Curated annotation (Swiss-Prot):
Binds 2 [4Fe-4S] clusters. Binds 1 [4Fe-4S] cluster coordinated with 3 cysteines and an exchangeable S-adenosyl-L-methionine and 1 [4Fe-4S] cluster coordinated with 3 cysteines and the GTP-derived substrate. Keywords: 4Fe-4S, GTP-binding, Iron, Iron-sulfur, Lyase, Metal-binding, Molybdenum cofactor biosynthesis, Nucleotide-binding, S-adenosyl-L-methionine. GTP binds at residues 29, 78, 109, 170, 272-274. It comes from Psychromonas ingrahamii (strain DSM 17664 / CCUG 51855 / 37). [4Fe-4S] cluster 2 binds at residues 267, 270, 284. Pathway: Cofactor biosynthesis; molybdopterin biosynthesis. One of its GO terms (biological process) is Mo-molybdopterin cofactor biosynthetic process. The gene is moaA. HAMAP family: MoaA_B. The lineage of its organism: Bacteria, Pseudomonadati, Pseudomonadota, Gammaproteobacteria, Alteromonadales. Residues 20-241 form the Radical SAM core domain. GO terms for molecular function: 4 iron, 4 sulfur cluster binding; cyclic pyranopterin monophosphate synthase activity; GTP 3',8'-cyclase activity; GTP binding; metal ion binding; S-adenosyl-L-methionine binding. SMART domains: Elp3. [4Fe-4S] cluster 1 binds at residues 36, 40, 43. The keyword Magnesium does not apply. This is GTP 3',8-cyclase.
Length: 339
């Protein structure tokens, strides 16, 4: 059986993003900056501290990178940070990625600080889907978690995103015991009449948040059981869902997604690769230090070498992370490679 053509060509097995465990990777998470203007207590409680002097990937380097991934079968790109909207050329980056043959969906994750005034422009540039980090629906708790007293402004941005016409608007909320766990009913009531997918994400341990993790980690399993006991039904997973478990209710316009990295077989459905803002390929959020791609990003003439390096790197991808053993790999914090 022949494989689906890409740009009129046929992909052979050696040119596909498939690892040794038959997982297929059609989703690229691309960080364009590790700078963030929030001080979230689970990620950058002391604010952004630059740890390198490297320049972030240029728009041309990004274009060359995504072109290579697209020719290897990638169909979706999520632009991440840090806070990606801090880059002045963010709309141009969206447009550049959206026009690459083979890329079917362009998404981003943002803290929403300037979303209310930019949502329409990003949509017009070619952005299809947007995730907004809203870690509490209580303004005071939001301020406590993020270090920013702009809850209403962020929520205005969420509304602006819906009005702009995005195919999908998602809300990300990191679950934290003793901080925002009391907000769960507020969240669920809120999406009753909102066409939004609410995503509860388990707090994950990184190199620098061990004490915070031990104090505030909360398993998503109890939320899952609560949902099932209250009329919610788990959707059959689609390939683009990745490890997320999605739930729907006939009386609710919105959906709920659970991302539980400590659950059994979480990595079995992994469908994504990550590239950092300085051009390092990361096979896992909690994996190794990464494979440098930048020396091959300066010119499109190196595209075949770039594709080969990416494919070869996949051979070393492990079957799973080792978070349950307290090993967070080389990830200092979630902003470092885009979460």
């Amino acid at each position: 059986m022949s494989l689906p053509p890409v740009f009129g060509k046929e992909l052979n097995m050696s040119q596909q993003l498939i690892d040794n465990f038959d997982r297929k990777f059609e989703y690229l998470r691309l960080s364009i900056t590790d700078v963030c203007n929030f001080k979230c207590n689970y990620c950058l409680p002391d604010g952004y501290q630059r740890t390198h002097e490297k320049q972030f990937l240029s728009k041309q380097e990004i274009t060359n990178l995504v072109n290579a991934f697209a020719e290897l079968g990638a169909k979706k790109v999520r632009i991440t940070g840090g806070e990606p909207a801090l880059r002045k050329d963010f709309p141009k980056i969206i447009e550049a990625i959206a026009t690459i043959p083979g890329i079917q969906k362009v998404a981003t994750t943002t803290n929403g600080y300037n979303l209310s005034s930019h949502a329409q422009a990003w949509f017009d540039a070619g952005l299809d889907s947007i995730n907004v980090s809203v870690d509490s629906l209580d303004a005071k708790t939001f301020h406590l978690i993020t270090g920013k007293n702009i809850f209403q402004k962020v929520m205005q941005g969420v509304n602006a995103s819906v009005k702009a016409g995005f195919k999908q608007v998602k809300i990300n909320s990191v679950l934290m015991k003793g901080l925002n766990d009391i907000d769960i009913d507020l969240y669920i009531n809120w999406i009753k009449d909102q066409p939004i997918q609410l995503r509860f994400i388990e707090l994950m341990q990184t190199e620098d948040n061990g004490e915070f993790f031990n104090k505030h980690h909360l398993s998503g399993e109890w939320i899952k059981q609560n949902l099932l006991e209250n009329g919610w039904t788990q959707k059959q997973s689609l390939s683009h869902d990745g490890p997320a478990q999605i739930f729907y209710h006939p009386d609710y316009l919105g959906e709920i997604g659970l991302i539980m990295p400590y659950s059994k077989d979480f990595c079995k459905s992994c469908n994504r690769l990550r590239v950092s803002s300085v051009g390092r390929l990361h096979l896992c959020l909690f994996g190794e230090e990464g494979v440098d791609l930048r020396d091959l990003l300066g010119t499109s003439a190196d595209k075949e070498k770039l594709k080969q390096r990416i494919v070869e790197s996949l051979k070393s991808k492990k079957v799973s992370h080792y978070l349950a053993d307290g090993e967070s790999g080389g990830t200092p914090h979630l902003a470092s490679i885009g979460g």
